[in-house]
Curated annotation (Swiss-Prot):
Its main location: secreted. Component of the acid-insoluble and acid-soluble organic matrix of the aragonitic skeleton (at protein level). GO terms for cellular component: extracellular region. This is MAM and fibronectin type III domain-containing protein 2. It is found in: Secreted. Keywords: Secreted. It comes from Acropora millepora (Staghorn coral).
Length: 112
């Protein structure tokens, strides 16, 4: 059992890539552990740690790749009762540049 994982999401050749990271569910057994997300310049743009943030609502992050052309996710799960569910995708440009489909009703509630 290795409690620490690091995933590096790399650009696959898309110009102006943006990563969409969805942190869907997090459980830290015995109040120990963390999940951190870093942009391509190494700046930490998201963190969740400890008991008071277990099973909290989804976090949906839009992250520019920057010069290094990657995004990094670090997870520390200190025991076998801990878990994190994370999904991601890579887009060309940001979500605001996407075209809306005429039949879809879209509302933006909160953008961070």
């Amino acid at each position: 059992f290795s409690p620490d994982c690091t995933w590096t999401i790399r650009n696959s050749g898309i110009s102006q890539p943006v990563a969409i990271v969805s942190i869907e569910e997090v459980q830290f057994g015995y109040c120990r552990g963390y999940i951190k997300v870093f942009d391509g310049s190494g700046a930490q743009i998201f963190t969740r740690e400890g008991c008071h943030e277990n099973h909290s609502s989804n976090a949906f992050l839009e992250i520019a790749f920057q010069e290094s052309q990657n995004v990094t996710i670090q997870v520390s799960l200190q025991n076998n009762q801990s878990y994190a569910r994370v999904g991601y995708g890579i887009l060309e440009d940001d979500l605001e540049s996407a075209s809306l489909l005429p039949a879809w009703n879209v509302a933006i509630e909160n953008k961070t």
